[in-house]
């Protein structure tokens, strides 16, 4: 009996050490409007070297590992998907059917793509579709290049602060009612040390989101280009402080979409960088047949890689 008690005591003393060496597995899906946006997001928010294994023109999969500030190890199954087809999300069906755990969604928007008028419609469609594909989701919306907000106001005659605020309140309301986090990513390239500090900040933010950790220390609601609002940290009252005339509950109503699209301006000239090297305009949605790849073959390779990694 004494030997048993001694063994139990030894196990108890070393339990925390044993647990600290375990690796938790997470599933994350990045849904991006373009390859360029995806490349930038991975470069900013993921560990160095992730771009080469996650970059894609349509769909990809890889496993990324990291150790957080608590010395906890994580293995993250990351899927990347480009929103350049009208049924892109359906490509994830076979992979989502394999999962029984929560899926972290990182839905990207990009201030440099001149498609702000479409954001609400695209988010509504994506969230509804995702909820049909999977029951257990953790949502986040990431708006890249939010420093472009200042350029739009400085260098165009159509963009004013009222438009920026209207988009912000719309996104905050949508995320509030859909239990989603909202993060603006603003890079400052003026100083190398500051740029590196920003990347470390956003990498920490991503880790906290994926690990379901408390994010109250990461809240920013004042600086328009640096908004950081984790799920559960916003409210109707806080949203209205931007402009009290805005009614957050209206975002849930069908008529609001038309109002949003009518109010948000566009720039006359669509930028050339929205076209891929193959000449496909990412402002438009195309059937999968347009892309010069064998979709079934690519999915087969990706699924084989997933099964090998998962040891199914």
UniProtKB/Swiss-Prot annotation:
Keyword Cytoplasm in record: yes
Principal place of residence: cytoplasm
InterPro entries named in the record: Dynein_light_int_chain
Record keywords: Cytoplasm, Cytoskeleton, Dynein, Microtubule, Motor protein
Pfam families tied to this protein: DLIC (PF05783)
Domain of life: Eukaryota
This protein's record includes keyword Cytoplasm: yes
GO BP annotation list: establishment of mitotic spindle localization; establishment of mitotic spindle orientation; nuclear migration along microtubule
Location in or out of the cell: Cytoplasm, Cytoskeleton
One CC-aspect GO term: cytoplasm
Family note: Belongs to the dynein light intermediate chain DYN3 family.
SUBUNIT field: The dynein complex consists of at least two heavy chains and a number of intermediate and light chains. Interacts with DYN1.
Function, in words: Component of the cytoplasmic dynein which acts as a motor for the intracellular retrograde motility of vesicles and organelles along microtubules. May play an important role in the proper orientation of the mitotic spindle into the budding daughter cell yeast. Probably required for normal progression of the cell cycle.
Note: Present with 1170 molecules/cell in log phase SD medium.
Name of the protein: Cytoplasmic dynein intermediate light chain DYN3
């Amino acid at each position: 009996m004494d030997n048993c008690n001694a063994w139990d005591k030894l196990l108890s003393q070393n339990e925390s050490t044993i647990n600290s060496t375990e690796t938790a597995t997470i599933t994350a899906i990045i849904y991006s409007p373009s390859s360029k946006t995806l490349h930038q997001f991975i470069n900013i928010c993921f560990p160095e070297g992730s771009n080469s294994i996650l970059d894609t023109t349509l769909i990809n999969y890889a496993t990324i590992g990291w150790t957080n500030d608590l010395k906890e190890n994580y293995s993250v199954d990351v899927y990347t998907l480009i929103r350049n087809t009208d049924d892109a999300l359906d490509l994830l069906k076979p992979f989502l059917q394999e999962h029984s755990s929560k899926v972290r969604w990182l839905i990207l928007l990009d201030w440099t793509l001149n498609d702000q008028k479409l954001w609400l419609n695209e988010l509504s469609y994506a969230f509804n579709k995702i909820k049909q594909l999977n029951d257990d989701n953790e949502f986040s919306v990431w708006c890249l290049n939010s420093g472009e907000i200042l350029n739009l106001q400085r260098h165009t005659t159509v963009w004013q602060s009222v438009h920026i605020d209207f988009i912000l309140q719309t996104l905050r309301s949508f995320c509030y009612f859909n239990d989603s986090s909202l993060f603006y990513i603003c890079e400052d390239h003026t100083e190398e040390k500051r740029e590196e500090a920003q990347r470390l900040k956003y990498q920490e933010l991503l880790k906290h989101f994926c690990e379901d950790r408390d994010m109250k220390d990461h809240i920013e609601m004042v600086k328009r280009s640096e908004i950081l609002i984790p799920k559960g940290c916003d409210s109707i009252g806080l949203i209205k402080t931007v402009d009290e005339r805005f009614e957050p509950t209206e975002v849930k109503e069908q008529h609001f979409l038309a109002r949003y699209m009518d109010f948000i301006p566009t720039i006359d000239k669509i930028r050339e960088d929205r076209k891929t090297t193959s000449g496909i305009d990412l402002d438009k949605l195309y059937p999968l047949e347009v892309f010069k790849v064998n979709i079934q073959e690519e999915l087969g390779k990706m699924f084989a890689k997933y099964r090998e990694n998962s040891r199914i």
